[in-house]
Structures are given as structure tokens and as C-alpha cells.
């Protein structure tokens, strides 16, 4: 049934985003803090910027680790990829899953 999808929805969504990033020629990295349980799903570096990326499989998009990472690294702007529409906040942008290619090709 749907139990497998429900249980692994986050992992499937992260895998989809990873495949999209690789298809765009980007080289994503993973980051975790050894002192706390925080993690950033992907760190992308292109010619102009470093982008910490948090992937959310649902519309419940609290991104505490991303917020803390941005707080600890002033000057960076985070990217959250989720099922929600586009939102631009001072510290982070949210883009829908279907807009990954468009976002990085600009």
C-alpha cells in the first residue's frame, strides 16, 4: 500500500532533488553538525555563491537547521525546496519542487 511511500517520502523527495541537481551539472554536498542534530540536505556552490538547501516533502516546511545555519553564516541566503509555492524572505527563498531547473538556470 501507501505505507512505504508515506514512511520514505522525505528520502524519495531528497533523492529527486539530488537527481535534478546532478542533471544540472551541480555538485551538491551534505553538511551536518557533530555537536547538534542539525543537518543541511545539500550545499551548492556555483560561480557566484554558496547556497544551503533544505528539502521538505510536504507543506509543513519548518526549517530549523537551515535557519540556524544562516544565522551562523551571515551573508548566505538559504534555499528551501518544498511543495509550497515561491516565497522570498530576507534569509531564505522557497521554491516548489517543479522549479529546481528554472531556479538554477537563471
Segments from the language model and where they lie:
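A cross-kingdom feature that marks ATP-driven nucleic-acid transaction machinery
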Residues: 1-106
Amino acid at each position: 500500500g501507501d505505507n512505504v511511500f508515506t514512511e520514505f517520502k522525505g528520502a524519495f523527495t531528497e533523492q529527486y532533488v539530488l537527481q535534478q541537481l546532478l542533471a544540472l551539472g551541480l555538485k551538491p554536498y551534505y553538511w551536518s553538525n557533530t555537536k547538534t542534530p542539525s543537518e543541511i540536505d545539500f550545499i551548492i556552490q556555483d560561480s557566484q555563491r554558496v547556497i544551503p538547501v533544505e528539502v521538505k516533502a510536504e507543506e509543513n516546511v519548518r526549517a530549523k537547521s537551515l535557519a540556524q545555519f544562516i544565522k551562523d553564516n551571515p551573508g548566505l541566503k538559504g534555499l528551501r525546496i518544498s511543495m509550497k509555492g515561491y516565497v522570498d524572505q530576507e534569509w531564505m527563498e522557497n521554491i516548489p519542487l517543479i522549479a529546481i531547473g528554472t531556479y538554477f538556470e537563471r
